[in-house]
């Protein structure tokens, strides 16, 4: 680019102005110079005379009111907004020419002139009696510096925005699809995923697609091969945590959020109205407080993988029996051995139940009620699970393995033995996994006491709705495990139905075992331990009266009294175990 001196630059500008003014047939604008260009500043002791093309002459000075700060204005330029367009400037061809003043960087500026690093021409404007100064378009040899000016303005704009929220460019974080590692378009079905995987999962859960993997259910799913195997793609969707109801809480519609606020306000008003009732110390929590606390229960916010991990960690330790190989079995010795083992397992069962997600959120009444209804079913499914690897035998403890012939020494025990062995064979045929087992055991705990008999003398559960929600959460976890194993949708439905049918069979075995244990108690064959006796009496109380053959009225009355006392004793044992656990944690 040709370099120009200051004098030649002014001459060149005069030539440009003359060329433009010739098209309008107007005389050329002349600027009288009294000193060199490098020494020309706007000073307080200087006045200038400018000859306008129309022939009018105006005198002005910096001390005159025409340059007061109230009348001086700067018209915004297009470059102030980072644009290279010159549409914001008035050309000499579009408006009558105005006097031009060249301002150069100097140590003493007039206080109302904007600083620039280079010479910038300004036009004087006369608008409704007030004068203003507007920056003109820079000539071609100033264009390289305009990029720097735009850059500095952008920096000032960004620095001003730092006081508020960050810009979209700084806050936007690149996320990738959890299934195929493509760029994620948003948070869909509980995970960050792309549009393709979101649409595929939506089609899969809405339709009845029985995908089959042509290989070994281990296909690689990435951006380029995600369409090669639908079965493995759906399996990976479940593995990364996709679920039907997985939506972000902050993405709910305005109507949903409005209804939520209205419900919370109504709950707060109800809480204030009943504040006097809440101050009274009661054994059971108020239903209003329980309802409010269950909204944000941690158990309902767990993912499938988190639920499985929590259930596996909650598993109780193995309990050894007091079996003596040198002592032969008879009815009394075997029943004593088994009841002692069951009594010690009950203590671990209570600790296990308190670690099941959502169980401790229930009232004390509901916790005791569920344990009293399900304790023998839980013991039996644990026995069946341990016996899977021992065909024809039952592993009651690591040091107590019994077969069918050994069970014949106890009257009525063979029938129960056969049902337990058949259930273990069914588990073995289905290849039941440990994760599925812990889910089934938790379902038994929460489901056994939900449907109480109308003839039951005890109060029903207080938080059935919340228990059903936790049950749904565990059932969804069970379905997630089946989908993760690579089963088709039809196979998942079939396996889930088979497992739930086995639970009804375990319930039948529990009823048979309860009747047998109660008969042993009535015959005084074996003394029952305290906790086991309480559980037995409480379970008899939960059963309908029609199930007993012909019990006498006095026996029923005594049983009711014993069971009521047993229930209170179990509550005290439960509370004492809690206090002991809290004391251990404190120590």
Curated annotation (Swiss-Prot):
Hinge: annotated span: 243-302
Domain NR LBD positions: 303-539
Predominant location category: nucleus
UniProt biased composition (Basic residues): 249-261
Region (Transactivation AF-2): 303-587
Location relative to the cell: Nucleus
Swiss-Prot/TrEMBL domain comment: Composed of three domains: a modulating N-terminal domain, a DNA-binding domain and a C-terminal ligand-binding domain. The modulating domain, also known as A/B or AF-1 domain has a ligand-independent transactivation function. The C-terminus contains a ligand-dependent transactivation domain, also known as E/F or AF-2 domain which overlaps with the ligand binding domain. AF-1 and AF-2 activate transcription independently and synergistically and act in a promoter- and cell-specific manner.
Entry function: The steroid hormones and their receptors are involved in the regulation of eukaryotic gene expression and affect cellular proliferation and differentiation in target tissues.
Name listed for the protein in its UniProt record: Estrogen receptor
Organism: Taeniopygia guttata (Zebra finch)
Taxonomic path: Eukaryota, Metazoa, Chordata, Craniata, Vertebrata
């Amino acid at each position: 680019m040709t370099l120009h001196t200051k004098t030649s630059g002014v001459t060149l500008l005069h030539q440009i102005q003359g060329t433009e003014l010739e098209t309008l047939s107007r005389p050329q604008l002349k600027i009288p110079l009294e000193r060199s260009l490098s020494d020309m500043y706007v000073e307080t002791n200087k006045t200038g005379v400018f000859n306008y093309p129309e022939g009018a002459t105006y005198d002005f000075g910096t001390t005159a009111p025409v340059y007061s700060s109230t009348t001086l204005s700067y018209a915004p330029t297009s470059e102030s907004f980072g644009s290279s367009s010159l549409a914001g400037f008035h050309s000499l061809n579009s408006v009558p020419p105005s006097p031009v003043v060249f301002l150069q960087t100097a140590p003493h500026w007039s206080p109302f002139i904007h600083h620039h690093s280079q010479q910038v021409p300004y036009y004087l404007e006369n608008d409704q009696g007030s004068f203003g100064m507007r920056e003109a378009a820079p000539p071609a040899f100033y264009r390289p510096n305009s990029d720097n000016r735009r850059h500095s303005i952008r920096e000032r704009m960004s620095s001003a925005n730092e006081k508020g929220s960050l810009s979209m460019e700084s806050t936007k974080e690149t996320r990738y699809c959890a299934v195929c590692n493509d760029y994620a378009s948003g948070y869909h079905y509980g995970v960050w995923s792309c549009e393709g995987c979101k649409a595929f999962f939506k089609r899969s859960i809405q339709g009845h697609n029985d995908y089959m993997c042509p290989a070994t259910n281990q296909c690689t799913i990435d951006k380029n091969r995600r369409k090669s195997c639908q079965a493995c793609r759906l399996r990976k969707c479940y593995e990364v945590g996709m679920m039907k109801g997985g939506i972000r809480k902050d993405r709910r519609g305005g109507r949903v959020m409005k209804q939520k606020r209205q419900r919370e306000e109504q709950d707060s008003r109800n809480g204030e109205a009943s504040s006097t009732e809440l101050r009274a110390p009661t054994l059971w929590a108020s239903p209003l407080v329980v309802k409010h606390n269950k909204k944000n229960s941690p158990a309902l916010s767990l993912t499938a993988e988190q639920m499985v991990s929590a259930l596996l960690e909650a598993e109780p330790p193995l309990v050894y029996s007091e079996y003596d190989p040198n002592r032969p079995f008879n009815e009394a010795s075997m029943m004593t051995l088994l009841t002692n083992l069951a009594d010690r397992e009950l203590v671990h069962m209570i600790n296990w139940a308190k670690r099941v997600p959502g169980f401790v959120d229930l009232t004390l009444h509901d916790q005791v009620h569920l344990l009293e209804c399900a304790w023998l079913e839980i013991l039996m499914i644990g026995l069946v699970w341990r016996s899977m690897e021992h065909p024809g035998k039952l592993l009651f403890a690591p040091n107590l393995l019994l077969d069918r012939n050994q069970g014949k020494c106890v009257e009525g025990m063979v029938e129960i033995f056969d049902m337990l062995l058949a259930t273990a064979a069914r588990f073995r045929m289905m290849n039941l996994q440990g994760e599925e087992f812990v889910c089934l055991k938790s379902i038994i705990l929460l489901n056994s006491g939900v449907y109480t008999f109308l003839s039951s003398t005890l109060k029903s559960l207080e938080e059935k709705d919340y228990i059903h929600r936790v049950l749904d959460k565990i059932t969804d976890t069970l379905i997630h495990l089946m989908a993760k194993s690579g089963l088709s949708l039809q196979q998942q439905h079939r396996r889930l139905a088979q497992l739930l049918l086995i639970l009804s069979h375990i319930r039948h075995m529990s009823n048979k075992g309860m009747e047998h244990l109660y008969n042993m108690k009535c015959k005084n064959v074996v003394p029952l331990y305290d906790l086991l006796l309480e559980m037995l009496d409480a379970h008899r109380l939960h059963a309908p009266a029609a199930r007993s053959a012909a019990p006498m009225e006095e026996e029923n009355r005594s049983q009711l009294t014993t069971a009521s006392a047993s229930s209170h004793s179990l509550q005290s044992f439960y509370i004492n175990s809690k206090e002991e656990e809290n004391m251990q944690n404190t120590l």
